[in-house]
Curated annotation (Swiss-Prot):
A motif (Twin CX3C motif) lies at residues 53-73. This is Mitochondrial import inner membrane translocase subunit TIM13. Gene3D superfamilies: Mitochondrial import inner membrane translocase subunit tim13 like domains (1.10.287.810). GO terms for cellular component: mitochondrial inner membrane. It is found in: Mitochondrion inner membrane. The keyword Nucleus does not apply.
Length: 101
């Protein structure tokens, strides 16, 4: 193993080749941030569904009617989440087209 590889002589610490252009690095960073935001959004969705639907609908002792409540709450929450996400994505895309981002 060469010392240059230990000290990052042939590659950067992020694992990208040293010959990467700044635009390649920028694209990779944008992609990574986008993926991390998607994971954070999915986590937030699961947390909110649990908080809002399960706590609202599930009571002890269990009753079959609770399944219907959870199903309806989840469907309503997902419709709302999708509508908000679409509006947000459209707004971001429009800002990108206009050069605001």
């Amino acid at each position: 193993m060469a010392l240059t590889s230990i000290f990052g002589g042939s590659s950067s610490s992020s694992g990208t080749p040293a010959t990467s252009s700044p635009s390649d690095v920028k694209t990779q960073l944008k992609s990574q941030i986008s993926q991390e935001l998607a994971i954070a959004n999915a986590t937030e969705l699961v947390n909110k569904v649990t908080e809002n639907c399960f706590e609202k609908c599930l009571n002890a002792p269990y009753a079959a009617s609770q399944d219907n409540c959870v199903d309806q709450c989840l469907a309503k929450y997902m419709r709302s989440w999708n509508a908000i996400s679409k509006a947000y994505i459209n707004r971001i895309q429009q800002a990108s087209v206009n050069g605001e981002i």
